[in-house]
């Protein structure tokens, strides 16, 4: 965030947990909004079940090859993430407390067919957030709406960013 100088960013996060913790624990007056893509605030049964299934897919399909494009040590990245979520002690993981301290508008983009989380995540945000929560439920998308429905995802993020950055007539440019 320090690299942004005096810019007033809207945080767009595929790492929604990290963005939630940041905006809920830092009153960074440069941030004017936060868009959370497929967020997790708690662990759900569907999360654990799907993460257990993906472990099998990692061992039996070309998933490792696909992920190696993004991770230098793909086994460490995958098994670190997978093992954490499947650890019985992780079932109590809950970051919803941070939501109450977010002081900027929140957009949540949630795929209808998210295999890792349900609308309960959205309900938690609506219950806990002090600021407005704008929810876009994206048909035809699962846990990666930015990849599975890029047009709808970009439209929702652009609309949110333009609203929170007060871009209304095009004369100042458009946020995307």
Model feature map: region roles:
Residues 132-134, 139-176:
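Catalytic active-site module of serine/aspartate enzymes centered on a nucleophile-bearing elbow/loop
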């Amino acid at each position: 965030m320090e690299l942004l100088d005096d810019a007033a960013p809207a945080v767009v996060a595929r790492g929604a947990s990290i963005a939630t913790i940041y905006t809920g624990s830092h009153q960074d007056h440069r941030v004017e909004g936060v868009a959370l893509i497929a967020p997790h605030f708690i662990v759900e049964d569907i999360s654990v079940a799907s993460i257990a299934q993906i472990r099998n897919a990692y061992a039996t399909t070309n998933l490792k090859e696909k992920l190696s494009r993004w991770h230098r040590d793909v086994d460490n990245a995958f098994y670190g993430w997978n093992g954490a979520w499947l650890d019985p002690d992780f079932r109590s993981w809950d970051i919803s407390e941070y939501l109450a301290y977010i002081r900027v508008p929140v957009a949540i983009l949630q795929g209808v067919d998210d295999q890792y989380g349900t609308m309960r995540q959205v309900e938690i945000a609506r219950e806990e957030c002090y600021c407005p929560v704008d929810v876009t439920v994206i048909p035809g998308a699962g846990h990666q709406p930015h990849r599975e429905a890029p047009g709808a995802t970009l439209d929702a993020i652009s609309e949110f960013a333009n609203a929170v950055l007060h871009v209304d007539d095009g004369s100042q440019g458009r946020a995307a």
